[in-house]
Amino acid sequence: MADGEVIEADLFIDCSGFRGLFINQALGVEFEDWSHWLPCNRAIAVPCERSEDFTPYTRSTAHGAGWQWRIPLQHRTGNGHVFSTRFMDDAEAEKILLANIDGEPLADPFKVDFKAGKRRQLWHKNCVAVGLAGGFLEPLESTSLHLVQSGIIRLVRLLPDGGFNPANVAEFNRQSDFEYERIRDFIILHY
């Protein structure tokens, strides 16, 4: 801890987001960068007034260097432009976003940087990475909540009653790799 306190546990679940405080910073598990397959690495988002055209679905629209989402909610509409900074700058991406929203913006646009990929191992030693600490696939298919839930279910199924069985750890990592790779390949098909 920052104050020098040491915390001991049989198992740590790293839910610390993109930083991966335990899995990456403490244990050094590397991140597999999948940007050569999924080049989008930034999103600019802005809420706007809800349109009278309230649709019960999310709309995804292709653009030159990425795509735009429109998510109608009860009191507003969520909008965002996901793009690759190798092919478009922020100013152009924001201009495209604001030109294609259905109402007046309710806030200033904000940007979110991300890198598509996953940790080489989601379970290493006595640490299991869940959620963004384990990996992120671009938001075209919103799989983050699914990956958290399936990771926890997988952990519960494979968690031994005492000690860590290397076969269970290996199986957890194998199943996690397979799931991330299947989702990655599905997203690639969109492009």
Can you say where each PLM-predicted feature lies in the sequence?
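Predominantly flavin-linked oxidoreductase catalytic cores and closely associated redox partners
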Residues: 1-99, 152
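A short acidic-Thr-Gly-centered motif at the start of a beta-strand
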Residues: 1-5, 118-125
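Short, internal active-site loops enriched in acidic
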Residues: 4, 115, 177-178
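A short acidic (Asp/Glu
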Residues: 21-25, 140, 181-185
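A short, acidic/glycine-rich surface segment
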Residues: 55, 116-118
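Conserved FAD/dinucleotide-binding core of flavoprotein oxidoreductases
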Residues: 63-115, 133-147, 158-165
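Residue-level marker for buried hydrophobic side chains located in beta-strands
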Residues: 127-129
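Active-site-proximal substrate-binding core of FAD-dependent oxidoreductases
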Residues: 154-191
